[in-house]
Amino acid sequence: MVNPGSSSQPPPVTASTLSWKRCAGCGGKIADRFLLYAMDSYWHSRCLKCSCCQAQLGEIGTSCYTKSGMILCRNDYIRLFGNSGACSACGQSIPASELVMRAQGNVYHLKCFTCSTCRNRLVPGDRFHYINGSLFCEHDRPTALINGHLNSLQSNPLLPDQKVC
């Protein structure tokens, strides 16, 4: 189990040193045949779990993700933070506790989720259009869209996504 972004390698484990390794999850001694090393700590395979879905990370893959004190499986990391963990508008990191807006798989800070034309913030319940990577409020959607020459990729009422499990 390797934490992406972590360059540390686990220290060698031998039969003589294994008896005193403690699990970072439960604090118990690790006497199992297999143990995991993630986030500079050793874990029982049953103790290294996703903070959201509680899946045992050793059983579902070879990597885990950490952010804001949470240990996450790949699916929950992408669901909560998008592929990059950064706002699609400003590029800045989004804290795990912050509410976000989403459009077509992109994640935005609330303050960055604005109309590309008038720069007014789009709020829950507003109708918007996502066209070629840009957000438009109902008033400022391109004339071609109104005339039916373009298809709106997103024109549903907007609901915020909360970064909690």
From Swiss-Prot:
GO BP: cell differentiation; gastrulation; mesoderm development; negative regulation of neuron differentiation; nervous system development; positive regulation of transcription by RNA polymerase II
Domain LIM zinc-binding: 21-83, 85-147
Keyword S-adenosyl-L-methionine: no
InterPro entries named in the record: LMO_RBTN_TF, Znf_LIM
One family name in Pfam for this protein: LIM
GO molecular function, one term: metal ion binding
Superkingdom to which the source organism belongs: Eukaryota
Keyword Repeat on entry: yes
This protein's name: LIM domain transcription factor LMO4.2
Function: Acts as a positive cofactor of GATA transcription factors to establish the identity of the ventral mesoderm during gastrulation. Down-regulation in the dorsal mesoderm is necessary for the proper formation of this territory since, when present, lmo4 may bind ldb1 and restrict the availability of this cofactor for Spemman organizer transcription factors. At neurula stages, suppresses primary neuron differentiation and modulates gene expression at the Isthmic Organizer of the midbrain-hindbrain boundary.
Keywords assigned by UniProt, alphabetized: Developmental protein, Differentiation, Gastrulation, LIM domain, Metal-binding, Neurogenesis, Repeat, Transcription, Transcription regulation, Zinc
